[in-house]
Amino acid sequence: MNESLNNSSRLAVLCSICLAICFFFYKFGFRILDPTNIGFIFRMGGDLATSYFGWAFLRESPWSFPFGKLTGYFSPIGSYSTIVGANPLLTIPLKLLSPLLPSDFQYFGWSLLACYCLQAYFGYRLMRLITSNIIQQVLGVGFFLLSPPFLWRITQGHEGPSAQWIILAAFTIYFENYSSIKNKNVILFWSLLIVGAFAIFTYFCAMVMAFAIAFSLGHVVFTPHYRLKLIGSVALYPLLVLATFASLGFLSSGISYQWDLLSYTTYSLNLNSFINPLRWSWILPGLPYRLGQMEGFNYLGLGIIILVGCSIIYLVWQRPKFNNLKYLAPFLITLLLFFIYAISNRVTWGNVVLFRYPLPEPVLRMANILRCSGRFGYPLFYAILYGALFCFVAIRRKTLSIVLMCTCLLIQIADIHKLLYDPVFHEAGPVVSPLKSAAWQSIGRNFDKIIIDPPFISAITDEDDYKYFLLYAYKNHLAIDTGFPGRLPLKRMQIYKDELQESLGSGKLDPKAIYLFADPIDAETLKIFHKWDQCALVDGYIVYTTDGRFLDGSNSLEVEPLTFREFLKKYEGNTILIAAREYLASALLPEEVKKYLLEKGSKLPALGFAGSYVGVFSRGQKVVEKISAKRDVKVEMRGQVAPSGRQVIADQDIELYSAGVPFGNKASIKIAGVEHSRGRGGLNIVAIDRDGNILASIFFGVNNPNRTTLCYTSK
C-alpha cells in the first residue's frame, strides 16, 4: 500500500514538473537557457536588465562584508547586488566560479525555469493535502502554473516577483501542520524559507514571516506541547530578517525612501483587480484602474473565475461540514491584514476613489518601505484559488469533478493565452549596441570612469539606452554613475549631483573620465558649461574629455537650444511626425504652442492624461492625426501619398504608433522600416524632408515640454 502510494506520488511530481517544463519552453523557447545569451535581457530591459548588471558588476567588485557590494555600478556611491535585484543565493556562489565563466554569462533563464518547476512542485504538495487522486492533483498544478500574476511577472523576466512558489511553500508548511505539528523541524523550515525569501524578494519575506508568526501564535493557543518553542520562534523570525538585512547590505546603503513621491497608495490593489484582465484576456474586456495599480495585477482568469463560482454554488448547495476551523483563523486574519495593506488608505474601484482615511506620517513612512502594496494581493489570489480547488476535489463524483476541472483549465488557457507565449524571448538575437565608433575602444583603454550629466538616468539619448553604457563599462572595467537600485540613497545622490554641477561650472574636470551629456542637454548645464565647442558627437552621443583626443575636426559639436514653438517654426516647411508616450498632459503645453496647433486644426491640445496620440504635419498643415484615451493609435502612410490622397509627404513609407500607459506605454516613428523615435516620455518628434531624410529627431519631455536642444556635427 505504501509502495503504491509512493509510486503514485512520484508519478504526480514527475507529471507536474513535466507540465511546468512544457509551459516554460512554450513561453520562452530554448535559447534562454544558453548562459551566454544576453540578447533577450537587452530586448526586455527594465528590471531584468537591472538584475543582470547587479550580477555583472558584482563579478568585477572585490569580496566584501556585507555581501554583494558593487563598486563600479552607480558610482561613486555604489550599491549592493541584492538591492539591484540580483539573487544572492545564486550570485554569491557563481562569483566564486567567475574566473571560469564567460564574460556574457547569465543565469536568468535557468532561474526562471526553476520558478516554473518550484511553482509546480509546491502546487502539487498543496493538492496532495486535499486529494489523493493523481489526475486532480496534476490538474490543480495546472491552475497554479496558469496563474496570471505569476505569468505576468515571469513575462517581465524579473526573477524576484516571479518566485511566487515561495507563497505556495508557505501555504504548504502551514497546511501540512494545520491542526497538529507533524514535523518537528517546522520552525527550521519557516526560518529557512524566511531567509531565502528575503534573499530573493523582500516582499515575499514579509509575507512568509507574517504567515510564520500567525502559525506560531495559532499553535501557541491550540498546541500547548510546543508552546515554549513557538513563543521563541515569534522572536526568532524578526531577528533572522534583521541579520539577513544587515549581511546583504541594506543597512550600509544609505537608503532614503521616496515616501512623499512614491507613496504606497500609488501602487495599491484596486478592488476590481481579481476580475480586471487589463489587456491580457481573450474574452473579458479590461477595466479601468488608477496609475500605478498594475503592481496589484491579480486577475484570476476566466477559468478560475468559473472555478470560484462553481465552488460557491457547491458550498451553498451541499453545505459541507469543516473540521478544525479554529486553526484556520490565524491564516484568515493574516490574509485580511494583507488585504487592508494592499488596498492602502486610498480605496479604489476602477479609476474612482471610493474613500480614503488619513494615516500618520510615521505610519506612511513605514508603509512605504514596501511601497508596492498591491503585491500583497498575491497571497489572496492563491488563497482564493486553493479554496476553490478544495471545494472542487470535495465533489463526491470524481468523474464530474475532473471533467469540470478540465473544462475550467481549458477556458483558462484560452482566456490568458497571450500570457503563455512571448515572442520577445524567442526572437531576441545578439545585443546590437549603438556604440559602434572606434573611439569607444580608446575610451576603454585610456579612461577609468564614465560620468553622465545628469547622473543616475536611464535615457541619455534614447529610451533605456543606459544599459548599453553599463555593458560597455562592465566589459571595459570602468566605473559609471548610472544604474537603478531598487532603493535610492537620495541624499548622497543629491550631494553628488551638486558636486558634478560645480565641477562643470568651474571647469575642474576629471582627466581620467569621459563625460556624456544627455540630449536634450540639462538646462542648468547648458548655462554653466562653456566648452560645447570642444565636445564631440560620437554615435549621436555628446562626448567631452579634458584632452580632446576624440576631436579630429570631423565630429566637433554645435548646440542649438530651441523652444517647442521655435522648433515648429524652424521645420514648418518640412514634414513633422509626432508620437506621444507616457503621462503627457496637454496642460503642460505652452499657450503659444496650443494656439499654433489649434490654428492647424490639431487635437493635440486635447490629449488627456496618459492618452495616445500620433500626428503628421507637412508644409505648415495638418495631414492626419489620431488621438484616444481608450486605446493605442496608429497611422501608416505607404508609398508617397498621404491618406488624403492629395499631398506627397516623402519618398518613404511612414509608420507612427502611440500607446498610452494603460495600453502599452510606447511611442514609435518608423521611416522605411527604421525606428527614429526617441521612445521617451513626452512628445517624440521627427522632422524629415521631401526625400525622407532625417532633419531632426528630438523629444519634448514630460517635465519640461517647452525646451530641447538640437545637436549637429559641424562641417
Predicted regions and their residues:
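Membrane-embedded helix bundles of polyisoprenyl
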Residues: 113, 117-126, 136-178, 183-219, ...
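Perimembrane helix-loop-helix junctions
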Residues: 2-4, 174, 206-239, 311-323
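Membrane-interface coil-to-helix junctions
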Residues: 23-118, 147-148, 277-280
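Short acidic-hydrophobic catalytic motif
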Residues: 558-715
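Membrane-interface micro-motifs in multi-pass membrane enzymes
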Residues: 83-87, 106-116, 143-172, 199-204, ...
